[in-house]
């Protein structure tokens, strides 16, 4: 799941909320947009029917997830010849969608901000800005919570949450939840400002970093007093500032988990500061791309192609080619035997574990620092996975003000990371009717990275044992959807359940994992950096298995990192004039 946050001011190229439908808020105005015309197959889905032939390029990117597309499109924008090869028949990776009988089912992110209005500090929004690819969005500011305290509507961008706290959350040991929340908001202001002081688009690892970072020095100096806090786990911030009310602490645990796939003890305070600022500044909004997550993928694919890049689907990489004498990555070999020679770089958007599998035996260990990198990869913890429930339902008689997002937590005492304890529900057709047939809704419910991988190891898809476990483990998803639509089972016309094995097979992900985790702990004495580099010359890795882990902003930041390892610093400076003025 992605909390892709940022919705700054009025200046930007995106259509206004009025052009796309009324903003959803306290007035509870439903989205009355005309049904979007059915389009021809998207750029993200159209693939060459002929097998990819051997050729030479500057950069080859393995995998067309958002991280890979960002890296490839930016590299093409900087003038590189780029070929992106994707094993699947559709681009997008964890953000891909699929269609059945007029429904568009989404497999991944559903919660966005900072994608459409420019300038923005969202790394993915900055990529779209760099590519001159506007992203039409529907704007809204409400979502529904089904928590142990009760079910209630909450808003971003104002103090409505204070009213919710006063109504639903009692005092505990003399601590008032509403007052504690207002105190926390004040404490978070310097944290939020510091978190936005240095955009990933400014970073590079060579000596010219002094040039690209120079314009951000004043902001970094202003943030200096809180830098130790933003580079520590957020749990330490809560402890230091004596945030004691159980509900406020639990709510921040939810936000941390939505953002990073980890609890507060495993989430950098910088990450939560960035998101907190985005959600709770006055008049903030969330965004839903018209066309769903696929619209982001299409925009990145357009940006790649219009700058001369190639996107080759159904093109499975069998191995990374490495020069035996120099130890440099020189290209890839596809399953059909074709070879793509990369004069400058191979960028892998496969997970680090899967990337290691397609390197020649001992190739990484043979280069300086390679042993340590292999050890680090093998020791990187895997996030848990997902259970997915995809539904197409009859919407007759459902209220016009049905919310797009619902969050369900069963038991605070178990913790938000506990298996089967937290579910997210997205009803995307509430805001974009084109995603379902007339009079229908499409629903995606999922456990956000809390499904244990080990439960599924050794099972074979399609067996009775597998089907029984799918039914058992998807029951909580049905319960969560029933919180939003009590009679949903009577309305179902299409129903599909996905498991970690689904993710492992269709997304070719190591064990079906959601990504990497475990870099941040309360006893850490060092903090990793966001970097696409590896010890092997010419090989870069991007995606959610690298620090800081899952999320659209995180993987887009890797795209910037990889592109700027290859681009001249003066072109990067020109780009910063545009995306981070």
Give short role names for the model-derived ranges.
Residues 1-37:
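N-terminal chloroplast transit peptides
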Residues 54-200, 517-518:
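N-terminal glycine-rich phosphate/pyrophosphate-binding loop and immediately adjacent elements
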Residues 109, 544-567:
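A conserved FAD-binding loop/helix module that cradles the flavin
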Residues 149-152, 157-267:
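Rossmann-like flavin
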Residues 248-263, 424, 483-548:
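A glycine-rich dinucleotide-binding beta-alpha-beta segment and adjacent secondary-structure elements
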Residues 274-338:
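Helical element adjacent to the flavin cofactor pocket in flavoenzyme catalytic cores
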């Amino acid at each position: 799941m992605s909390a892709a946050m940022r919705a700054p001011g009025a200046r930007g190229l995106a259509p206004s909320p009025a052009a796309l439908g009324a903003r959803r808020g306290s007035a509870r105005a439903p989205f009355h947009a005309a049904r979007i015309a059915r389009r021809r197959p998207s750029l993200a889905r159209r693939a060459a029917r002929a097998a990819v032939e051997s050729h030479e390029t500057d950069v080859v990117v393995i995998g067309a997830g958002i991280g890979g597309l960002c890296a490839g499109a930016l590299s093409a924008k900087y003038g590189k010849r780029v070929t992106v090869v994707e094993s699947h028949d559709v681009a997008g990776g964890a953000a891909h969608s699929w269609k059945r009988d007029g429904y568009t089912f989404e497999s991944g992110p559903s919660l966005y901000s900072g994608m459409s209005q420019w300038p923005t500090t969202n790394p993915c929004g900055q990529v779209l800005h760099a590519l001159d690819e506007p992203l039409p969005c529907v704007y809204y500011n409400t979502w529904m919570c089904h928590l142990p305290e009760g079910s209630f509507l909450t808003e971003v961008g104002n103090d409505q949450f204070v009213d919710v706290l006063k109504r639903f959350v009692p005092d505990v040991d003399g601590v008032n939840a509403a007052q504690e929340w207002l105190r926390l908001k004040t404490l978070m202001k310097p944290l939020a400002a510091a978190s936005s002081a240095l955009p990933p688009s400014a970073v590079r690892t060579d000596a010219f970093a002094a040039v690209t970072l120079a314009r951000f020095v004043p902001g970094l100096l202003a943030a200096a007093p809180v830098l130790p806090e933003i580079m520590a786990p957020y749990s330490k911030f809560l402890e230091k500032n004596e945030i004691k009310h159980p509900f406020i602490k639990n709510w921040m645990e939810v936000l941390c988990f939505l953002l990073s796939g980890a609890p507060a003890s495993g989430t950098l305070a910088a990450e939560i500061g960035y998101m907190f600022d985005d959600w709770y500044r006055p008049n903030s909004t969330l965004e839903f791309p018209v066309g769903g997550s696929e619209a982001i993928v299409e925009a990145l694919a357009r940006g790649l192609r219009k700058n001369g890049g190639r996107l080759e689907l159904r093109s499975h990489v069998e191995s990374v080619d490495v020069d035996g004498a120099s130890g440099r990555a020189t290209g890839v070999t596809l399953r059909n035997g074709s070879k793509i020679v990369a004069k400058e770089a191979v960028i892998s958007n496969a997970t680090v574990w899967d990337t290691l599998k397609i390197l020649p035996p001992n190739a990484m260990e043979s280069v300086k620092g390679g042993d340590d990198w292999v050890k680090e990869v093998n020791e990187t913890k895997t996030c848990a996975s997902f259970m997915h429930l995809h539904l197409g339902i009859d919407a007759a008689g459902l209220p016009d003000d049905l919310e797009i997002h619902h969050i369900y937590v069963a038991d605070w005492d178990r913790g938000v990371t506990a298996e089967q304890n937290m579910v997210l529900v997205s009803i995307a057709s509430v805001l974009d009717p084109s995603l379902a047939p007339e009079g229908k809704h499409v629903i995606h419910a999922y456990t956000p990275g809390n499904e244990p991988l080990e439960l599924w190891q050794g099972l074979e898809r399609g067996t009775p044992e597998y089907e029984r476990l799918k039914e058992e483990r998807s029951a909580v998803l049905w319960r969560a959807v029933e919180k939003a639509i009590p009679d949903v089972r009577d309305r179902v016309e299409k129903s599909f359940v996905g498991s970690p094995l689904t993710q492992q097979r269709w997304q070719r992900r190591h064990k079906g994992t959601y990504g990497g985790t475990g870099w941040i702990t309360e006893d850490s004495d060092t903090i990793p950096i966001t970097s696409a580099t590896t010890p092997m010359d010419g090989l870069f890795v991007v995606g959610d298995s690298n620090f800081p882990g899952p999320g659209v902003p995180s993987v887009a930041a890797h795209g910037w990192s990889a592109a700027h390892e290859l681009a001249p610093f003066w072109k990067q400076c020109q780009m910063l004039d545009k995306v981070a003025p």
